[in-house]
From Swiss-Prot:
Belongs to the DnaJ family. This is Chaperone protein DnaJ. CDD domains: DnaJ (cd06257), DnaJ_C (cd10747), DnaJ_zf (cd10719). Homodimer. Participates actively in the response to hyperosmotic and heat shock by preventing the aggregation of stress-denatured proteins and by disaggregating proteins, also in an autonomous, DnaK-independent fashion. Unfolded proteins bind initially to DnaJ; upon interaction with the DnaJ-bound protein, DnaK hydrolyzes its bound ATP, resulting in the formation of a stable complex. GrpE releases ADP from DnaK; ATP binding to DnaK triggers the release of the substrate protein, thus completing the reaction cycle. Zn(2+) 1 binds at residues 146, 149, 203, 206. One of its GO terms (biological process) is protein refolding. Gene3D superfamilies: 6.20.20.10, DnaJ domain, Urease metallochaperone UreE, N-terminal domain. The J domain is necessary and sufficient to stimulate DnaK ATPase activity. Zinc center 1 plays an important role in the autonomous, DnaK-independent chaperone activity of DnaJ. Zinc center 2 is essential for interaction with DnaK and for DnaJ activity. Zn(2+) 2 binds at residues 163, 166, 189, 192. One of its GO terms (molecular function) is unfolded protein binding. The keyword Zinc-finger applies. Keywords: Chaperone, Cytoplasm, DNA replication, Metal-binding, Repeat, Stress response, Zinc, Zinc-finger.
Length: 371
């Protein structure tokens, strides 16, 4: 079953502002939340709204989605996903705190598995490397589970203990006086930071965090045809997960150096070829550089400057495997700045012959001279 357009899911136009996107999400998330909605397919709609907001609320994800659709958002050319949290501290608890007064929403289990954070790595390629693809070994700083304590944070030979202040629940009850009477709210236990567990003896390597900072070498395959600004997702190569959760993803953002001769427009390559007046007037066969090697191009007699020739299949491969682009050669006449006396005489002779030309151009030229 094909996915619905994210703008359609939120009931917005493609030009919607961030504020409009946020308001639409809050309204629909409240409407379809399983704890509130009685609709039969509320869970599916809630997940659909969540997914749409996660993409459209992020500038980078939204740009990729607008350009590539769902393929860009979900198949390696999208933005940063998978963490479960939304930017700016806005999540499900915010919805319920605004509607139900602070503690009424479902609270996330602090000990539940959570996916690790995504990472971003910038790489710069030469023009040809982007065309043909490349395999890179990159070194990135990551937080991995501590080998000494196996990620527990506790000193080897010891274990975490149940927090005595919250009895392992990770939450404590707090009474609050309001105009409506006394209300009991549940909030995260400050002693165990909401985990329900405490470390009596911390691991000396990670100091109780369960993680250590290290540099990790990762092999990245750059696909042929990738363009400037596109990114590659390497699944599971981000930060380590929490409480046994999966690792985040690594996003490699590609920058491509400009080329002195070639320019790129999508899968097509554009270049300008300088030719002499004689070559364009009389016709010639010239060698044209391409990223695939030199090819011969026939220039017909009488070719005008600015004429464009197409070299089929000599462009960049489509990054998704949808065929091959072409190369377009734009010819430009080069006017010599230094001439010998003989060359000048020949040009004067040619100019004199042009005066006697009975072609339309010649007639027009004489008409403007009043002849």
């Amino acid at each position: 079953m094909s996915k619905r357009d994210y703008y359609e899911v939120l009931g917005l136009s493609k030009g919607a502002s961030k504020d409009e996107i946020k308001k639409a999400y809050r309204r629909l998330a409240k409407k379809y939340h399983p704890d509130v909605s009685k609709e039969e397919n509320a869970i599916e709609k809630f997940k659909e709204v969540q997914e749409a907001y996660e993409v459209l609320s992020d500038d980078q994800k939204r740009a990729q989605y607008d350009q590539f659709g769902h393929a860009g958002a979900n198949q390696g050319f999208g933005g940063f996903g998978g963490g479960g949290d939304f930017g700016g501290g806005f999540g499900f608890e915010d919805i319920f705190s605004s509607f139900f007064g602070g503690g009424g929403g479902r609270r996330r289990d602090p000990n539940a598995p959570r996916q690790g954070a995504d990472l971003q790595y910038q790489v710069t390629l030469d023009f040809e490397e982007a065309i043909f693809g490349k395999e890179l070994n990159v070194e990135i700083p990551v937080e991995d589970p501590c080998d000494t304590c196996k990620g527990s944070g506790a000193k080897p030979g010891t274990s975490k203990e149940t927090c005595k202040h919250c009895s392992g629940s990770g939450q404590v009850s707090v009474e609050q006086n309001t105009p409506f009477g006394r209300i009991v709210n549940r909030q995260a236990c400050s002693h165990c930071s909401g985990t329900g567990q405490m470390i009596k003896e911390k691991c000396t390597t990670c100091h109780g965090s369960g993680k250590v900072r290290k540099r990790k070498k990762i092999n990245v395959k750059i696909p042929a045809g990738i363009d400037n600004g596109q990114q590659i997702r390497v699944s599971g190569k981000g930060e380590a997960g929490v409480n046994g959760g999966p690792a985040g993803d690594l996003y490699v953002v590609v920058h491509v150096r400009s080329h002195e001769f070639f320019e790129r427009e999508g899968d097509h390559i554009i270049c300008e070829m300088p030719l002499t007046f004689a070559q364009m007037a009389l016709g010639a066969e010239v060698e044209v550089p391409t990223v695939h090697g030199k090819v011969k191009l026939k220039i017909p007699a009488g070719t005008q400057t600015g004429t464009e020739f197409r070299l089929k299949g000599k462009g960049a491969p489509n990054v998704r495997g949808y065929g091959q682009g072409d190369q377009y050669v734009v010819v430009r006449v080069v006017v010599p700045t230094k001439l010998t006396s003989h060359q000048k005489d020949l040009l004067r002779e040619f100019a004199g012959q042009e005066e006697q030309d009975d072609s339309l151009f010649g007639k027009l030229k004489r008409a403007f001279k009043g002849e």
